Amino acid sequence: NLWQFENMIMKVAKKSGILSYSAYGCYCGWGGRGTPKDATDRCCFVHDCCYGKVTGCNPKLGKYTYSSENGDIICGGDGPCKEVCECDRAAAICFRDNLDTYDRKTYWKYPASNCQEDSEPC
């Protein structure tokens, strides 16, 4: 769920998901359309696509189990929400791997009017 995703981002990327990724670019936050603006925004695009493939679990509300070892996330269990955990894990790692190009000044609260192109397919 979103709270678990927030905690996962904190563990892996050492940033607050809410304060760093909830309104970034065209895809980080609610909804999304257009072309991802940078590598971080692409992390969110891929995360949205991943959520779109999940069945049997509400990604924003469903709980999953995971543990953290040496900064890595291990998704546990075999329930339907394990897929959500794997989506969240991949996004948190993607955020961490792209911290060097994260551009808050340009893409934080990026206007939706700049995201009007047709979305590329997942």
UniProtKB/Swiss-Prot annotation:
Its EC number is 3.1.1.4. InterPro entries: PLipase_A2 (IPR001211), PLipase_A2_Asp_AS (IPR033112), PLipase_A2_dom (IPR016090), PLipase_A2_dom_sf (IPR036444), PLipase_A2_His_AS (IPR033113). The active site is at residues 47, 88. It is an enzyme of class 3 (hydrolase). Its main location: secreted. It holds the Pfam family Phospholip_A2_1. Disulfide bonds join 26-115, 28-44, 43-94, 49-122, 50-87, 57-81, 75-85. GO terms for cellular component: extracellular region. One of its GO terms (biological process) is arachidonate secretion. It is found in: Secreted. Keywords: Calcium, Disulfide bond, Hydrolase, Lipid degradation, Lipid metabolism, Metal-binding, Secreted. SMART domains: PA2c (SM00085). Ca(2+) binds at residues 27, 29, 31, 48. It catalyses: a 1,2-diacyl-sn-glycero-3-phosphocholine + H2O = a 1-acyl-sn-glycero-3-phosphocholine + a fatty acid + H(+). Expressed by the venom gland. GO terms for molecular function: calcium ion binding; calcium-dependent phospholipase A2 activity; phospholipid binding. Homodimer. Belongs to the phospholipase A2 family. Group II subfamily. D49 sub-subfamily. PLA2 catalyzes the calcium-dependent hydrolysis of the 2-acyl groups in 3-sn-phosphoglycerides. This is Acidic phospholipase A2 1.
